Amino acid sequence: MMQPKRTKFRKAHKGRIHGVASSGATLAFGQFGLKAMEPERITARQIEAARRALTRHMKRAGRVWIRVFPDLPVSKKPAEVRMGSGKGSPELWVARVKPGRVMFEIDGVNQQIAREALTLAAAKLPIKTRFVARIAE
């Protein structure tokens, strides 16, 4: 699973996801992509599950680019622990995803297989997504 090799700080504030994606909103590498339509925090496990669904349906043909990276630590207190006494320890890593962000891109397969693969990947994610394709040149 993806996580940063090192960070400046161990814990982070929760924060909010405002506005729409300005960077990363268009296809940059592949011919087809999966675009987020809702703001959400996507966990490293969800990204990995979507990646596996993609590569397995494509039968390892073509190329996959993951355009989001989980760089935000989420802390959690252990079960049955009373409130207070500080913030919990880091439990998982998430990526903040804004609406309009292209999360996955693929190339080297035809449009039908790409659409099926990205639909399977979208089922692993907790947000509404849209299939996007580069206009034929």
Swiss-Prot record:
Show the HAMAP family listed in the entry. Answer: Ribosomal_uL16 (MF_01342)
Q: What is this protein called?
A: Large ribosomal subunit protein uL16
Q: Which GO terms describe its biological process?
A: translation
Gene name in the database record: rplP
Query: Among its keywords, does the record have Iron?
Result: no
Q: Which CDD domains match?
A: Ribosomal_L16_L10e
Keyword hit for Protein transport: no
Q: Which UniProt keywords apply?
A: Ribonucleoprotein, Ribosomal protein, RNA-binding, rRNA-binding, tRNA-binding
Output the Gene Ontology terms for molecular function. Answer: rRNA binding; structural constituent of ribosome; tRNA binding
The UniProt entry's coiled-coil ranges are none
- Name a GO CC annotation attached to this entry: cytosolic large ribosomal subunit
- The organism named in the record is Rhodopseudomonas palustris (strain TIE-1)
Q: Which domain of life is it from?
A: Bacteria
Do you know which InterPro entries this protein is assigned to? Ribosomal_uL16 (IPR047873), Ribosomal_uL16_bact-type (IPR000114), Ribosomal_uL16_CS (IPR020798), Ribosomal_uL16_dom (IPR016180), Ribosomal_uL16_sf (IPR036920)
Q: How does it assemble?
A: Part of the 50S ribosomal subunit.
Please describe what this protein does. Answer: Binds 23S rRNA and is also seen to make contacts with the A and possibly P site tRNAs.
Q: Which family does it belong to?
A: Belongs to the universal ribosomal protein uL16 family.
Q: Which SUPFAM superfamilies match?
A: Ribosomal protein L16p/L10e
